[in-house]
Amino acid sequence: MNHQDRRGLPFKGEGAPKHWALMKWAYVLISLPILGMYRVEAMNEDNIPDGPCILAGNHVSYMDAAVLWSMMPKGPLHFVAKEELYKSKFLAWALDNLGVLPVSRGTADRTMISRCKALLQAGDRVAIFPEGTRGRERENLDELGQAQNGAAFLAQHAKVPIIPVGIEGTEKIMPKGAKFPRFPKVVVNFGHPISADDFEGSRREKLDALTRETMKEIVALRDTARVEIEKRKGRA
């Protein structure tokens, strides 16, 4: 089965994952050890609406998606992942059945956009890392990579808000040179909803402004999460 054929498997009708039971069991199997071993804490989770939204966060570790997923008991959360991950047959099967959406990076992936829009219209949530790839290779992890407009474009077309998310601590789980994982404190900080309608100008100007504001909020939320971790260390 080729990549294009696999892209439709996670969905029934307007976007339901193929196996809800598998998703629920995966949530339990992934979230319990993550919440236990890595001492994950959520800040301001009340900012997450009950309805559809796009979560947009910084990306410095392969654990970012798993940590964010473990924080979302309210309902399904679907991630957008680079299509290169689908080269592995087992990983492709797992991602398909968990409702993950492959995206062709560097292109206007209309298939991914239509699938995401269907999920959002069905009331689900979608998570996107605007940087497009992990920032682990950057010299300075404090600097976020160049943001893509995908999250803002989707929010604009689906008429849903973006929830900026600052993730801090995941980069310490498996730092460069480490042979074994570590178990740091991880904080996930959720920001207030941002909408394209919050800005003035043309459609394009609103799109760019939404992307800039989202990235600005992600940095601020991550920095606040970092301060919280340092406070906890001081009280330990």
Language-model region placement:
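Non-catalytic C-terminal accessory region of glycerolipid acyltransferases
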Residues: 1-18, 111-236
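A transmembrane-helix-recognition feature enriched in membrane-embedded lipid enzymes
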Residues: 2-47, 89-98
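Short, basic, glycine/proline-bearing loop/turn elements
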Residues: 29-30, 97-103, 133-138
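A generic structural signal for well-ordered alpha-helical segments
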Residues: 33-35, 72, 94-95, 119, ...
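A secondary-structure boundary/capping signal
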Residues: 44, 58, 81-82, 99, ...
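Flexible, charged surface loops at secondary-structure boundaries
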Residues: 47-50, 121
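Catalytic core of membrane glycerolipid acyltransferases/transacylases, capturing the structured
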Residues: 49-107
